[in-house]
Amino acid sequence: MQESLTLQPIARVDGTINLPGSKSVSNRALLLAALAKGTTTLTNLLDSDDVRHMLNALNALGVHYSLSDDRTRCEIQGQGGPFNTLVELELFLGNAGTAMRPLAAALCLGTNNVVLTGEPRMKERPIGHLVDALRQGGADVTYLEQENYPPLHLKGGFTGGNVTVDGSVSSQFLTALLMAAPLAPGNTAIDIKGELVSKPYIDITLHLMKTFGVEVENQNYQRFVIQGGQQYQSPGHYLVEGDASSASYFLAAAAIKGGTVKVTGIGRNSVQGDIRFADVLEKMGAHITWGDDFISCTRGELNAIDMDMNHIPDAAMTIATTALFAKGTTTLRNIYNWRVKETDRLAAMATELRKVGATVEEGHDFITVTPPAQLQFADIGTYNDHRMAMCFSLVALSDTPVTILDPKCTAKTFPNYFAQLARISHSA
C-alpha cells in the first residue's frame, strides 16, 4: 500500500524557517573539497538522499571524511588532485543528477575504471551531451545500456583541448566540465552550443571554484577558458547557504495565506539564482523584505503572471501551484528542461493540477494555469519527485484538504519538509 499524507486546510501561516543547506551547493562543495589540497570543514551541509549518494561515492573512491551526528557538518581530507582507482568500482547514485554529472566528468581525469549507475529514472535522464564533450577532450567513456544515458563506464583520458557542449538541456553538463577542467593536464576551452539554460546554476559553480582557488575566464556564457594543470586549494571552512529552491514553498505559502514567513540562511547576496523566486511573488502582489541572511514574505492580493522562467526552473514549479491562488491565467515559459528532471515535470504538473480542478494547457516548453472557483480534493501523485510533493502541499492553503502520495520522496532534498510546514501552519 502506498504511503500517503493528508493535509487539512491551513487558515494562516506565520513564523520563521531555518533552511536546510542547498543541494546544488552541498554536492559541488563536497566534490571540490575531495579534489582539493588540504582539509575542508563544510557546515550547514544538506542531509538528504542526493548528498548521501555523493558521500557514499566519495567514500568508495577512497576519500576520508567525518560527519557530525546530524550529518550537517563534514570534515573532508582532500586528495590534492584527481581520483585514481586501482580496482574496478561500481557507484550507485540513486536519482542524483548533482552527483552523476560532476562525478562522470571528474572520473574522466586520472586513471580510472568506474561504472556510474542509479535508479531506473536515472537511466532515463540524458547525459549524452556531457559524454560527447568529454570524448572531445580525450575521455574513454562507454554506454553500458542505452546510448546517451547512464549507466556509464569511465576510464579516464580527459586531457583538455577545445570542446563544445550543448547548453540547452541541462546546465549540469557544463558545471561538470568546468569543475573537472582545471585538473586536466592541458588547457580547456568550452564553447556553448544553443541557449544555455539555468545560467544562475553556472554562477554557483564558478563561485565555488573561486572559493577553492580556481578562476575561470567566462566570455559572456558563450565560451569558458580554463587553465589546465591546476590544483584546488581548500578554503579551510565553508558555510553552505540555505536551499533557495526549498525556501520557495514557505515564501509562497506566506504570499497565499500569510501572516509573514521569514526564511533564514539565504539573503540578498546569495549565490543561488532561485532567490529570484521572491521577485516573482512580488510581481504577483506579495510583499517581500530582503536582508543579508533572510527573505521574508507577507501576504498580498495575488494576480496571474506571464513570464520566462528559464533562470529559475526548480522554483518555477512552485509558481505553478501558487497560480491556483492568483487571479487570472498564469503562463510559465521556456521551461523545457522540466521534462528531463526527476520526472517529466511538465506532464506531471499538468496532470496533477487538473486533478484539483485547474484548467491547464501543457505546451512543449510552457504551461498555463487557470484556477477553478473552488479547488477539488485529490490524491496527488508525486512521481518519486520531491518537488511535486512540496509544490502540491500548497493546495492545503485553501478550504480543501489534499492528500500527498509517497510524501517521503521529499527526502531527496528536504526530509523534514512536512514537519517544518506544520510548524508555521495554523488551522481555522
Curated annotation (Swiss-Prot):
Q: Which GO terms describe its molecular function?
A: 3-phosphoshikimate 1-carboxyvinyltransferase activity
Task: Report which superkingdom the organism of origin falls in.
Answer: Bacteria
Q: Enumerate the UniProt keywords alphabetically.
A: Amino-acid biosynthesis, Aromatic amino acid biosynthesis, Cytoplasm, Transferase
Name of protein: 3-phosphoshikimate 1-carboxyvinyltransferase
The positions flagged as active site in the entry are D314
- Protein's UniProt keywords contain Membrane: no
Query: What residues does phosphoenolpyruvate bind to?
Result: K23, G97, R125, Q172, R345, R387, K412
**Source species:** Cronobacter sakazakii (strain ATCC BAA-894)
Its EC number is 2.5.1.19
